[in-house]
């Protein structure tokens, strides 16, 4: 039984997505009361909260998954405080759950077993910027927008851009991605080094303290072990990231198509032609309609590609020429251009607002995002089949995706008080995930496993790989205190 269905067993009239909680830690008499005093000796009175509103805020993210709040929320201001607090938790066997901005979509911050939430928002400094080396080190409270604002006058930027203004260390923890991944890669290839506090309070530097080479062959890749670990192996307290030069020119375009097939075929052909496109995003007719209504736009309500080209003026001419020829051959419209920064900003804001635009289609309902990713050659087939599945089962699920790397989302909007609809959505998400696995893809391209995809992870990687992961977890966190119940 998947967590999605287990959640129904703990349903309420308002929100059936409630996961059960086994309070095997904090139920021990007096444990929380004793540790709060110890926490305050480290972080001060203002750095510790047991207030119900604060705990509720830090016990949920943007997902449909709902758990009980943590017992305590701490607000460390330095890695030394994180380490000291972790040692207290380790001694009392209290679970630790890291919290960045709460924008995750897989229930990664839920306190399944109670414990202590480490809210890292006060650690918000950009520590070391090396302009000549194109890298920067940040604390976990720095968000992607905050970093790019800091970099505004340097000629550099950090391009990984998930829809929300997520914290950069949270993005590393989930191996996040975004609209620029087709050109600049995901978090996994843009993290050079991490500082991590382990379950017992030990501080680990995954590539060696202060090291930031662009490449290394020195031993096991511990940095990539922690990227995507979702807080289950340790708390990330610093990240050293690659930066990129801001391109000489950027231009965006919108192109409409007569069918889903023709739009996705164009995507595959553009990539196969070797066009170094910076962004290529697909929105189906339902999603375009939602974006139009939410952002007061007037794009044609048909399957659509949002595209962006980066480079020199001369280089972009060739990119645009090839792309226009391909889209025209597939029945695409003439490009509607967005050349100045303000117009491009409105276009990409509409794409980044897709989650909220989808929610606005059915006020009062909840949203759930799928996250499959397949090899790009299988993309036309899976999107067409998925669209047919949505229509056949009367599910509101506008599609948007980073189709340049084979990743797309169905932003499913549903009434959680309607058991028939919940069951139809559950069955659909299971079919979609297994359709992706059958096409040599993955159940999650960028959101992570969290609470809801643990069974699918086992299907995807197999029992032996799960055993290896469990062995790594047991070595680094033998008491299972780091974000228990997630991933594995």
Q: Where would I find each of the regions flagged by the language model?
A:
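Activity-critical C-terminal alpha-helical subdomain
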Residues: 202, 454-488
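Alpha-helix capping/hinge segments and adjacent helical runs
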Residues: 44-45, 437-449, 474, 478-482
